[in-house]
């Protein structure tokens, strides 16, 4: 083994002994640094002849390449060892139980709304949607509510910016405006047929959604839900209202022995009008009459505001509170519990 082979072997051994990158750099300096052994060998060629320089320089370069290869290999080995140590320090114990992820669910009122839509959908009713910021015309005027009606007072209605003094904007106080909007669009769609005396398909729609009134106690909230229904055609009677709503209540409460009664009442948008009460024959509420909805035959002025002839088209409307239906179905006495955001309470209804 000549001098250069011994030099390469010596470098390999020294590099292998280095335990850290810093140790390796110190070992490198002994061979490849400014005063390293390879550098000294290169300097020693100054006294050689041209031919000797060629052969000696080539041999030194081969040795230098061997040293650099050993240096690169050791650098990689140290980097791999450092990575493995780092990964080992951060290893996860997969046998530990994971953190429990809470499972969400629909709000009980949302469940009620879905149930209402499903029942009326099976009877052929569409579902209407509309803006919660409504115009005075759709909310009151179109529904035959006179200008001096108490409901128009700021004590009962939230008025908002926008609109005009003659037609202010407000947070809708019921979902009836959605019925009018739906009916107006329906009539517009079939206007040519109506003008030709060919008639139109019946208007059969429910309008569920949020409504707002200045009211707050155990059974009332400033924001509450309503679902109103409308059926207009050429031969729709109060009898149809009784059949439809009776079927709905029995299906919703899953009770065939449920009893309904219609009490005479007054609403500006229906004539005649009736409050609807139900009576359970069994359970904790058995024997009590519970008010669940208002209803009546659609007033001729409202039919006229929909763009129809009240002499030819007639129908019924009803309005109920999904919040109250939810209270009755689950036996909850305080409406505010549904909107306090208490997960412990709401999770019972999943």
Curated annotation (Swiss-Prot):
State the free-text cofactor note.
Binds 2 magnesium ions per tetramer.
Q: Which GO terms describe its biological process?
A: phenylalanyl-tRNA aminoacylation
InterPro entries recorded for this chain?
aa-tRNA-synth_II (IPR006195), aa-tRNA-synth_II/BPL/LPL (IPR045864), Phe-tRNA-synth_IIc_asu (IPR004529), Phe-tRNA_ligase_II_N (IPR004188), Phe_tRNA_ligase_alpha1_bac (IPR022911), Phenylalanyl-tRNA_Synthase (IPR002319), tRNA-bd_arm (IPR010978)
Which keywords fit this entry according to its UniProt record? Aminoacyl-tRNA synthetase, ATP-binding, Cytoplasm, Ligase, Magnesium, Metal-binding, Nucleotide-binding, Protein biosynthesis
Q: Where in the cell is it found?
A: Cytoplasm
Q: What's its catalytic activity? A: tRNA(Phe) + L-phenylalanine + ATP = L-phenylalanyl-tRNA(Phe) + AMP + diphosphate + H(+)
Binding residue positions for Mg(2+): 271
The cross-references to PROSITE patterns, in alphabetical order and at most eight, read: AA_TRNA_LIGASE_II (PS50862)
Question: What EC designation does it have?
Answer: 6.1.1.20
Cofactors (names): Mg(2+)
MF terms in GO = ATP binding; magnesium ion binding; phenylalanine-tRNA ligase activity; tRNA binding
The record's comment on protein family reads:
Belongs to the class-II aminoacyl-tRNA synthetase family. Phe-tRNA synthetase alpha subunit type 1 subfamily.
Oligomeric state and interaction partners are given as: Tetramer of two alpha and two beta subunits.
Annotated protein name in UniProt: Phenylalanine--tRNA ligase alpha subunit
Q: What organism is the protein native to?
A: Delftia acidovorans (strain DSM 14801 / SPH-1)
UniProt gene name:
pheS
């Amino acid at each position: 083994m000549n001098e250069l082979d011994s030099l390469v072997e010596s470098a390999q051994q020294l590099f292998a002994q280095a335990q850290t990158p810093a140790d390796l750099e110190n070992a490198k300096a002994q061979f490849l640094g400014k005063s390293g052994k390879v550098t000294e060998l290169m300097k020693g060629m100054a006294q050689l002849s041209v031919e000797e320089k060629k052969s000696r320089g080539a041999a030194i370069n081969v040795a230098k390449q061997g040293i650099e290869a050993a240096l690169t290999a050791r650098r990689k080995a140290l980097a791999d060892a450092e990575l493995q140590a780092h990964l080992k320090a951060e290893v996860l114990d997969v046998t530990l139980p994971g953190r429990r992820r809470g499972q969400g669910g629909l709000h009980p009122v949302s469940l009620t709304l879905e149930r209402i839509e499903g029942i009326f959908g099976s009877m052929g009713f569409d579902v209407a949607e509309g803006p919660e910021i409504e115009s005075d015309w759709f909310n009151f005027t179109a529904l035959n509510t006179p200008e001096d009606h108490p409901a128009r007072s700021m004590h009962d209605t939230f008025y908002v910016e926008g609109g005009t003094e003659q037609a202010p904007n407000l947070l809708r106080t019921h979902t009836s405006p959605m019925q009018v909007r739906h009916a107006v669009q329906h009539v517009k769609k079939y206007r040519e047929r109506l003008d030709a005396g060919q008639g139109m398909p019946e208007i059969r729609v429910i309008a569920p959604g949020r409504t707002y009134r200045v009211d707050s106690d155990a059974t009332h909230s400033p924001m509450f839900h309503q679902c109103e229904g409308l059926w207009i055609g050429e031969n729709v009677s109060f009898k149809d209202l009784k059949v439809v709503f009776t079927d709905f209540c029995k299906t919703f409460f899953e009770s065939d022995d449920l009893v309904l009664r219609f009490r005479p009442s007054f609403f500006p948008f229906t004539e005649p009008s009736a409050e609807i009460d139900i009576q359970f024959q069994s359970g904790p509420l058995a024997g009590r009459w519970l008010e669940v909805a208002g209803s009546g035959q659609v007033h001729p002025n409202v039919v006229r505001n929909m763009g129809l002839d009240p002499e030819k088209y007639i129908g019924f409307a009803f309005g109920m509170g999904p919040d109250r239906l939810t209270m009755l179905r689950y036996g909850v006495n305080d409406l505010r519990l549904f909107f306090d955001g208490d997960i412990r309470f709401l999770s019972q209804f999943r």
